A protein has these predicted regions:
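Divalent metal-cofactor coordination and adjacent catalytic microenvironments
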Residues: 1-96
């Protein structure tokens, strides 16, 4: 896992018991990153970890898909980070 449940809850500032939803979002974010880059990353890769946290937070905050559009700023950051992970990442052990 790129991100633990506790890390994700702290990142999105959730005190309640939404563990099942957040765990599902973490798994979905990891799969999204894998499909976008074709690579599997470990927690040692800080860029991948941060991208996972961004995705989990965005999806959690916009999980109802009603109302405001998702932040365009977040979308731009996500696209940029995916490109960096896809083309600029070396072997996992080298990235700390």
């Amino acid at each position: 896992m790129l991100v633990t449940l506790e890390e994700a809850k702290e990142w999105i500032r959730v005190d309640g018991d939404d563990d099942q939803t957040i765990t599902m979002l973490i798994k979905a974010a990891e799969l999204y990153i894998y499909k976008a880059t074709g690579k599997t990353f470990t927690q040692a890769n800080e860029d991948a970890k941060l991208l996972c946290l961004f995705l989990v937070a965005d999806w959690y905050e916009n999980r109802l898909l009603v109302g405001e559009k998702a932040s365009e700023k977040i979308r731009t950051i996500v696209q940029s980070m995916i490109l960096q992970l896809q083309y600029a990442s070396g072997p996992q052990e080298e990235r700390k």
